[in-house]
Amino acid sequence: MEQFHATTIFAIHHNGKAAMAGDGQVTFGNAVVMKHTAKKVRRLFQGKVLAGFAGSVADAFTLFEMFEGKLEEFNGNLPRAAVELAKEWRSDKVLRRLEAMLIVMDERHLLLVSGTGEVIEPDDGILAIGSGGNYALAAGRALKQYAGDQLSAKEIAKAALEIAANICVYTNDHIIVEEL
């Protein structure tokens, strides 16, 4: 899969809770940090769904709007809305050029949605995307496995992002965490 710089999004289902975290850095090109406090994790569908993006900010806003429309159309059915978004995203000539990836979740489902048509639900209840995604994913899996009985979903999400921010130059430590 394509890597998008300037962000890290991490999401986890753990002990009956769902949490998603994202950093606040927006990078212009490969050299200039333009913003430190962007909000890349949002609540959708009356606060029942969390969505986070990696990639172009303008493209992400387009995808958030489209995804929220699909959630409304399918009455909050997250898997169906994600599949329909992925189908439309992949088949439309203009949308196909959008450079972003989404993680979407509710209390039961956690999904990665990409413009190549993938809708992936992880086996372990953890997903991460963006330039620091691999670092956050490794940290989150370790935290869940070795300290999961002592940490909440929200604490794991925040710690995974903090670790990624210490490694990835495109990820900062201005972290937003949302929980369901």
UniProtKB/Swiss-Prot annotation:
SUPFAM superfamilies: N-terminal nucleophile aminohydrolases (Ntn hydrolases). Keywords: Allosteric enzyme, Cytoplasm, Hydrolase, Metal-binding, Protease, Sodium, Threonine protease. It holds the Pfam family Proteasome. It catalyses: ATP-dependent cleavage of peptide bonds with broad specificity. The active site is at residue 7. It comes from the Bacteria. Na(+) binds at residues 165, 168, 171. It is found in: Cytoplasm. GO terms for biological process: proteolysis involved in protein catabolic process. Allosterically activated by HslU binding. InterPro entries: ATP-dep_Prtase_HsIV_su (IPR022281), Ntn_hydrolases_N (IPR029055), Proteasome_sua/b (IPR001353), Proteasome_suB-type (IPR023333). One of its GO terms (cellular component) is HslUV protease complex. It is an enzyme of class 3 (hydrolase). The keyword Hydrolase applies. Belongs to the peptidase T1B family. HslV subfamily. Protease subunit of a proteasome-like degradation complex believed to be a general protein degrading machinery. PANTHER family: ATP-DEPENDENT PROTEASE SUBUNIT HSLV, METALLOPROTEASE TLDD. A double ring-shaped homohexamer of HslV is capped on each side by a ring-shaped HslU homohexamer. The assembly of the HslU/HslV complex is dependent on binding of ATP. This is ATP-dependent protease subunit HslV. The lineage of its organism: Bacteria, Bacillati, Bacillota, Bacilli, Bacillales. The gene is hslV.
